[in-house]
């Protein structure tokens, strides 16, 4: 006979309690650690894009597959696709040119020069948040239109390359001559987690241009690619948009001329869509029902497509030939009187009040309309500086064509790194300053040359700390986002890097290495700087009782000052480098978060970061030669002392002041200060994930493993920009 308790005890009747319904019981559901501790250190950012998420496997070689591609056959198929209007998403004027240009633009336009993240180089428009970005409404249709072509050519063309190539072909098919195309963008298989899109919780939250100038954000509102086309915060005022336009395009590394060319060129073809109220538009792809199969924004207004399409809510056609390249954008901009009005969806735009009806309807050849412009288009006429450039382009269409071709190429290739990464038959021969060009190699050191150089470096009088510091300073500028920086080029010896505060100690070794380079004439300074690190690490390992060979691949070259854009390289100066215990500003995040940020830019895993920090500390590689984090009495010896002493419970740690940036480690019995540390040191004992790794390296049997792991991570950083070794 059952008791009253049995009535509520499903196990008493042999039923599994987890099959009885109620709350979500799926893996990953429920309250997470980030819900409980929202400020938890994002160590997970170092585990992105592993081979476990890659269906192609770690042996897949995209460059090799691309070499098998019928490139011009692909372009022919893309050209045909442009005019193959599909009933489920009819083409405006029978052409998808404007749609594909917007797709490419919005893929590339997420790039931010200040941190190198974003951009089109990884095909991120396939994933959230970008696949459901408010500014990307209807681009799900563009990507779906491309699927038959991607399906046909398979892995010979990445989605990332296909998106940009489709934009190029759209321009070419419209009568425009592009600057060229470089392939080489490899797909990833999950969203980037490291891109900081902002801290706003609501879409289209306004940001002030002054705030944009201080932050690595590329848009004036959360969910936009650039600026609100209705003006800042829907102001409807063209002049008020000028500062926002400069801030957002400037964050991409674009100057005023490039900005004007991109806006005008992008708005020479196609149209915006605002046939009816945006309240008719359904959820974005991420929120859409499963039966929508990855599409979103289904509209209930009329047919929902074609003449009834709603995208931005604006209903603008700029030129008389929206499927053919022209200079009509500038002609219309300056020829007519513009009056503010509203689209059928209620969005603010401008009509050419004194113009005849010269704009063709996208679906009814018998209809015409007046030219229309966005608020931000008129900024190019009414802002004094933009107006000068716009009038020059009005009077010199060829100058406009040249400027747009170059700016479009820059926009779509800005995050690809040096030109050596480009592949394909349409790579331009010209070197461009924003590509951080390098000269051709002039040295080819033999194995004996390298041995002789290592002896010269070892006998130079430079300490292990100096050797390691100069190599790290040179290589650690690399950014995995846009593939800029790194040791190749020896730009540590050039402006502006030579004058960075973080490099003050490191560059003191440069004259010695420059002398060795000149006297030997066997290798570039870039190679000798990296070789100095090799010598330092090998000496430190030997002092620890281990004979270690640090791999070294010669072939680096030395850049000239005229090949170095000082303003753009200033963006590579770190606000913090936890590997060297450096921090310039205290108003940007926490020291430990900035360490993760730096490690992620260097494409390091959590164990690699941990090994490098522990090794750099015992080698005395702090930027200012301080003792913070140097938990050893054997500086210059590659030991695991950092981890052993950090985890030693004989010491207790207390902050030295209210900032809690620096700490003293005191002996619990005597109260004597034994060590000092920064947050970038103590995080390896504080954070549970990093402590787990540190415990491995602190173990009594871990010394040799630690040294080998340090060397592997060190070589990885030294070679991050050696794309010729891939």
Curated annotation (Swiss-Prot):
Family to which this protein belongs: Belongs to the peroxidase family. Peroxidase/catalase subfamily.
Source organism (scientific name): Shigella boydii serotype 18 (strain CDC 3083-94 / BS512)
Residue segments, region Disordered: 1-33
CDD domains: catalase_peroxidase_2
GO MF terms held by the record: catalase activity; heme binding; metal ion binding
Tryptophyl-tyrosyl-methioninium (Trp-Tyr) (with M-252) crosslink site(s): 105-226
Record has Oxidoreductase as a keyword: yes
Binding site for heme b: 267
Subunit structure: Homodimer or homotetramer.
Protein name, as recorded: Catalase-peroxidase
Post-translational modification: Formation of the three residue Trp-Tyr-Met cross-link is important for the catalase, but not the peroxidase activity of the enzyme.
An annotated GO BP: cellular response to hydrogen peroxide
Site entry: Transition state stabilizer: 102
Covalent link (Tryptophyl-tyrosyl-methioninium (Tyr-Met) (with W-105)) residue numbers: 226-252
Annotated active site: 106
